[in-house]
Amino acid sequence: MVDESNAGPVAPAVVADAEVKAPTGKKRSSSRPQKAPPEPAQPKMPAAKRRGYSEQERSEKLRLIETKVSEGNTLKDAIKSAGISEQTYYHWKGAAKSAAREDIERTRPLSAGDEFAELVQLEEENQRLRKQLAEKLRTENTELRKRLGLD
């Protein structure tokens, strides 16, 4: 069975006064599918609250760790048994060391030259304070005289 409608040669179609438009600009692609709305965030577990230790608690834990290490435990095990992290241990140890160094510097005896310089400084401060007190007493005295009508 032959289809007779397609059997002959095809004549070109001529369209008069038709303008051929050249493509201009970018071709638009088909619209993209919309993004799915973000899933609601799962409620996060609250982070563990930081525990603040007092100076006394810190020094007790450091002493506890030192005694456990001297008994033969490893440093890591001693720190774990104290309930703090290694980082916290080293931070506390450094702070305690610097505080001890400051105490030593404060209690160090002064040399003769330092003692003399400190004495001169104290005498200057004493003179300044005496002048300040005298001026304050003078102004207070004049105000009292005015109130009493003695001036």
Curated annotation (Swiss-Prot):
Residues 1-65 are annotated as: Disordered. It comes from the Bacteria. Keywords: Nodulation, Plasmid, Repressor, Transcription, Transcription regulation. GO terms for biological process: DNA transposition. One of its GO terms (molecular function) is transposase activity. The keyword DNA repair does not apply. InterPro entries: Homeodomain-like_sf, Transposase_8. Residues 7-23 have a biased composition (Low complexity). Residues 52-65 have a biased composition (Basic and acidic residues). The keyword Repressor applies. Belongs to the SyrB family. This is Probable transcriptional regulator syrB3. It comes from Rhizobium meliloti (strain 1021) (Ensifer meliloti). The gene is syrB3.
